[in-house]
């Protein structure tokens, strides 16, 4: 067994002792100088069901969600306590926590206020925030977010008002044209939120419930069962009035904006899509049915448009909102090597433990020959039971080698002090392997002892290093590293939070390697 301090590691990083021939330089610093940017990620290993980067390393992600659900549809750049922002201070904070991914909401409502005309100003702002994330080592998952689809339903997601009718100074000036949700789609008595309430909400000239406070009288998650919401989702999936085509065209626009962006790890097609018009077809409520019956068609429609401008970026797809069982027959366009199953865990609607859910998702990955990532889970302050559930989720994702993205960034902070809640920060600041130069067999982090363990099978053809994220807040006094077999890995510290481990050039065949990192 080999015990080496991080100080000694900086020296050993450039030395590789061979059985014969003395010492040969293995220039870790030179490798990082030759590869100064973030590694491009655009492939899934269909045998291991894990995401891999351009160097062949298996990649893991810990991160958070950043989504703006109302105008102006993006988080402000300026940092202020109690304000949900996403600027330089925020990405610095996320980097310091040890995170390496952000699921960044790209509102369709904000991006296409007039049908067929895109708000380039908003898209440029989103690209600026994506670039800012790259400067601090954060990947971005481009996410088209929705909750209950539209503001006409007390939600958000699809475009609502495209323009005002009539000349200025006339009554018609205040009439809005709605290019997605139309008032005549359902009879007046079935308008939102029927049947949650027997009397539909009054609406303003834009078709939004008025006063807005009415929205608080209905459980938003139950709004998916309202007649108007079901009808609208059904029309999207059936491509009524070309709405499915418009959705796909928006994705083509986004892909054309990001095709050359190194830190974009994928395109998340739509957040938590509802099953469709379950009032017209009740079988859609059976877990798994909507996935193959209505969602596969929309995902293929969008994926085809994406691939006209971007052949490489991973396409992330979700199952229906209830997300209990996966019912997909195939991944978008049938290529699991360029697709990722994006799934969530909340209880309810999940009925089983997080461990059972992750095991079921593993079976989905094997069946669909793709990878899966937990892109939302409960990551906010709560009672003892909820906090224990979060701790259990952290252990379970490690045990199943699953990447995760918590919901949501703004929940991390105390709104009064602007300081992170320690109970949440400790989970965000876990040690984990961001990149593994081979096939990972297991990894774990014990928050009580601060000990991280990794076992993997090396791949001597991969010259890039294994990278372990060790947040300074978790290891304030440094750390010690134990490697077996001795001499199999050479250490280097490219930055304050990363331990790089280069496989020794003396190793010509695959071997099993174990790494243990513990605090000083």
Question: What do these predicted regions represent?
Answer:
Residues 1-24:
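Fungal secretory targeting signals
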Residues 47-61, 66-314, 319-327:
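Active-site mouth of glycoside hydrolases
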Residues 20, 27, 37, 160, ...:
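Generic low-complexity segments that are intrinsically disordered, proline-rich and/or Lys/Arg-biased
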Residues 25-57:
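N-terminal module-boundary/linker segments of secreted carbohydrate-active enzymes
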